[in-house]
From Swiss-Prot:
Keywords: Ribonucleoprotein, Ribosomal protein
PANTHER family per record: 50S RIBOSOMAL PROTEIN L36, CHLOROPLASTIC (PTHR42888), LARGE RIBOSOMAL SUBUNIT PROTEIN BL36C (PTHR42888:SF1)
Stated family: Belongs to the bacterial ribosomal protein bL36 family.
Name this protein carries in UniProt: Large ribosomal subunit protein bL36
InterPro entries given in the database record: Ribosomal_bL36, Ribosomal_bL36_sp
Native organism: Persephonella marina (strain DSM 14350 / EX-H1)
Mitochondrion recorded as keyword: no
SUPFAM superfamilies (alphabetical): Ribosomal protein L36
Length: 37
């Protein structure tokens, strides 16, 4: 899980979602997981 100021999709399978007021990227590839911090 990377914590970044700007989260972006890194492939077609990445999905941007909002959890607990935070924007996150979830993907099949675990390396693409990101969280806005």
């Amino acid at each position: 899980m990377k914590v970044r100021s700007s989260v972006k999709k890194r492939c077609e399978k990445c999905r941007i979602i909002k959890r607990n007021g935070r924007i996150m990227v979830i993907c099949e590839n675990p390396r693409h997981k990101q969280k806005q911090g």
